[in-house]
Amino acid sequence: MIPKEEIMGIFEKYNKDEITIATVGSHTSLHILKGAKLEGFSTAVITTKDRDVPYKRFGVADKFIYVDKFSDISSEEIQEQLREMNAIVVPHGSFIAYCGLDNVESTFKVPMFGNRAILRWEAERDLEGQLLGGSGLRLPKKYNSPDEIDGPVMVKFPGARGGRGYFPCSSTEEFWRKINDFKAKGVLSEEDVKKAHIEEYVVGANYCIHYFYSPLKDRVELMGIDRRYESSIDGLVRVPSKDQLELDIDPSYVITGNFPVVIRESLLPQVFDMGDKLCKKAEELVKPGMLGPFCLQSLCTENLELVVFEMSARSDGGNNTFMNGSPYSYLYNAEPLSMGQRIAKEIKLALELKMIEKVIS
C-alpha cells in the first residue's frame, strides 16, 4: 500500500486554489464531474477518443486526458498529467477495473478521494464476508463447495463485473452444466471458476442502498436507493412461462441500467443501523474505515428483514439514478444533491478546514 505520507507529500506540492476533480469516463463519472463543477472545482475526464461524446455533449469536463486504452490510466505519463492538474481522483467501479487493484494500492501515486485500502475488501469475497459478517448484518448462507449445494443458490464471481456470469442453480450437476456453458461462450475463465462464490438464494425485493460517510461530520447519510435492470432476466420474465420452457435459455444477470426506488419508511431505522454498523466495523478492520460513498445491496424478505448480499466501498452505479437528487438526499438541506456533488462538498469543506488528510489517500 502506498504510504499515506507519500500521498500527502504529493498533495502538499499542489496549488490548493486550483484543485481538479478527475475520474475515468465511465460508470458514475457524469455526476461526479457535474457535482464537482457545481462546487466550483475544475474537472478532468480520462477517456478514449471513441467514448468522449457524453462528456462533451453534457459539458461536465473542463479537461480531457486521452488514452489509447483504459488500462493506460495507471501509466506514469497519465499520473504525471493528473498531478500537474492538482488532481484528486474519485474512484468508481470502472476506474478500479481498468487501473487494476494492485496498481491502485501500489503504483498509482495520485491523491484519491476515500480510503484506497478498503477497495480490496469489496473485491475479494472472503474479505467482504469478514467485513459484512463482522458488522452483524444478515447475510445469505455461504457454500464452500459445489458439492454442498442442497437447494436454490446464486453463483457469483469477484470484481466489478456488473453481474456478468452470475447464475442461479439448485444442484451440483446444474452448477457444472452452467459453468461449462459460460466457459464455452467465453464469459468465464478457469480462474473465474476457481473463485466462484456460492450463496443461498434469498427470495425478496431488491434494494441497493447508497450511503455517504462524512469523516468531517462523523455521520452516515442515506443518499438514495435503486434497483437494477438486468439482461436477460428482466426480458425473460416478460415471456409467458410455457414459452420460457420451450426457449430453454439460461438467464443472465448483466446490469444494463438502474431505476430509483423508495423503501417502506418503517424500514429506515434498519437501513441506518446497517450503515452505522458497517462503518464502525470498517474503522476497526481497515483504518480509517469507510470514507465517502458506499452501497449495500440487499433483499427485503416477506418478513421485512433486509439481507445484504454485496457491498460497494466507493461510488456505485446506482448513484446515477439521482443525478439531480433523490427523495432522501433532498431531505438534508431541501435542495437536490447528487452523490457527485456530495463528494465535492466534502472535499471543499476539507480544504477549507485544512483537514484534507481526512478524506484522501
From Swiss-Prot:
Binding site for Mg(2+): Q297, E310
Keywords from the named record: ATP-binding, Ligase, Magnesium, Manganese, Metal-binding, Nucleotide-binding, Purine biosynthesis
Binding site for 5-amino-1-(5-phospho-beta-D-ribosyl)imidazole-4-carboxamide: H27, S94, N258
Annotated EC: 6.3.4.23
Any one GO MF annotation of this record: ATP binding
Catalytic activity reported: 5-amino-1-(5-phospho-beta-D-ribosyl)imidazole-4-carboxamide + formate + ATP = 5-formamido-1-(5-phospho-D-ribosyl)imidazole-4-carboxamide + ADP + phosphate
The protein's annotated pathway: Purine metabolism; IMP biosynthesis via de novo pathway; 5-formamido-1-(5-phospho-D-ribosyl)imidazole-4-carboxamide from 5-amino-1-(5-phospho-D-ribosyl)imidazole-4-carboxamide (formate route): step 1/1
Metal-binding keyword on record: yes
Cofactor: Mg(2+); Mn(2+)
InterPro entries: ATP-grasp, ATP_grasp_subdomain_1, IMP_biosynth_PurP, IMP_biosynth_PurP_C, IMP_biosynth_PurP_N, PreATP-grasp_dom_sf
ATP-grasp domain sequence ranges: 116-348
Function per UniProt: Catalyzes the ATP- and formate-dependent formylation of 5-aminoimidazole-4-carboxamide-1-beta-d-ribofuranosyl 5'-monophosphate (AICAR) to 5-formaminoimidazole-4-carboxamide-1-beta-d-ribofuranosyl 5'-monophosphate (FAICAR) in the absence of folates.
Family: Belongs to the phosphohexose mutase family.
Protein name per its UniProtKB record: 5-formaminoimidazole-4-carboxamide-1-(beta)-D-ribofuranosyl 5'-monophosphate synthetase
Lineage: Archaea, Methanobacteriati, Methanobacteriota, Methanomada group, Methanococci
